């Protein structure tokens, strides 16, 4: 089955160029989708949701342009890139790395160079990794993303199992900062307006097909909450200090649940973080590493 989903020979040749654009409206809508502005009187959030004054894109918005470009490759049969063809129900977002290589503009036209990085045989499943470099119209690199997909049923071709990813364990001490924030019951419906239209996050009947009693929150929405919390608690709420974020998605979140971001400072520029679902005591995000600029 895996051979039908992943053709390493073809995948290794991938150097796909995709395009996308966004405006200040998209930037503000994304910020609302990851909880900014839930208190309209909170001055610290206004710069991310109100286009006048000192308007900024949230750093984790850097995942959206390339994500939407990748989603444009979806066909009626599912996700379809050279060397990989899998239906959406076979794909799980395993890990995400996002790095800002220039100040994030509040509107832009971008080109995204998509390169295949690795595929590992975790029979009967597989892990596939892509790297995406995004440049503006002048050719300047704006952001870089690495996406790791867990492909259900995609393994079994006898390939390399790959390295065991080192766990990033929180220090054995109390967190340096904790932010607790309840998501809205319609949080997934709001976040999906940024481009991820997967019915798993909107259609109760569709969600039940995958064992959930109701739609779940997008993993990248939880990712956005964590990035916003770290920026606020550890970087003085200054998006210019935010360099990169890497996480592993561990547990689904249901809209309306409470996210608890726990943060530990390590050195001058590194933060270890995790996201706990308060109501169930489950870690939704593990192995969080966020880097700031010097």
Regions found by a protein language model. Give the residues of each.
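A contiguous, surface-exposed recognition patch within enzymatic or periplasmic domains that forms
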Residues: 3-51, 166-222, 229-232
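Catalytic-pocket segment enriched in acidic/His residues
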Residues: 205-289
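Phosphate-binding glycine-rich loops and adjacent basic patches that engage nucleotide phosphates
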Residues: 23, 71-78, 149-154, 183-194
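HotDog/MaoC-like acyl-thioester-processing domains
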Residues: 2-16, 68, 91-179, 253-256, ...
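Hydrophobic, proline/glycine-rich low-complexity stretches
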Residues: 2-109
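Generic structural "secondary-structure junction" signal
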Residues: 50, 63, 93-94, 100, ...
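Amphipathic, positively biased hydrophobic alpha-helical segments used for protein targeting
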Residues: 42-46, 73, 118, 150, ...
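Generic structural signal for residues positioned in beta-strands
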Residues: 29, 47, 59-62, 97, ...
């Amino acid at each position: 089955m895996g051979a039908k989903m992943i053709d390493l020979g073809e995948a290794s040749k991938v150097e796909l160029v995709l395009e996308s654009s966004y405006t200040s409206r998209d930037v503000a809508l994304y910020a609302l989708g990851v909880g900014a502005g839930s208190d309209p009187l909170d001055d610290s959030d206004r710069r991310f949701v109100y286009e006048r004054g000192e308007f900024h894109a949230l750093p984790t918005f850097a995942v959206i342009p390339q994500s939407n470009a990748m989603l444009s490759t979806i066909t009626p049969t599912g996700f379809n890139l050279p060397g990989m063809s899998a239906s959406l129900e076979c794909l799980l977002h395993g890990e995400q790395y996002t790095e800002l290589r220039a100040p994030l503009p509040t509107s832009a036209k971008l080109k995204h160079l998509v390169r295949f990085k690795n595929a590992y045989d975790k029979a009967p499943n597989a892990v596939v990794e892509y790297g995406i470099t995004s440049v503006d119209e002048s050719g300047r690199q704006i952001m870089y993303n690495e996406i790791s997909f867990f492909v259900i049923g995609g393994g079994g071709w006898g390939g390399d199992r790959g390295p065991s990813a080192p766990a990033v364990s929180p220090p054995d001490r109390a967190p340096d900062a904790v932010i607790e924030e309840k998501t809205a019951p319609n949080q997934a419906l709001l976040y999906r307006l940024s481009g991820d239209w997967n019915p798993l996050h909107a259609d109760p009947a569709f969600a039940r097909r995958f064992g959930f009693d109701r739609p779940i929150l997008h993993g990248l929405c939880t990712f956005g909450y964590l990035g916003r919390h770290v920026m606020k608690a550890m970087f003085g709420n200054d998006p210019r200090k935010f360099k990169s974020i890497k996480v592993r998605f561990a547990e689904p979140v249901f809209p309306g649940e409470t996210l608890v971001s726990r943060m530990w400072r390590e050195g001058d520029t590194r933060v270890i973080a995790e996201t706990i679902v308060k109501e169930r005591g489950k870690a939704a995000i593990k192995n969080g590493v966020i880097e700031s600029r010097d």
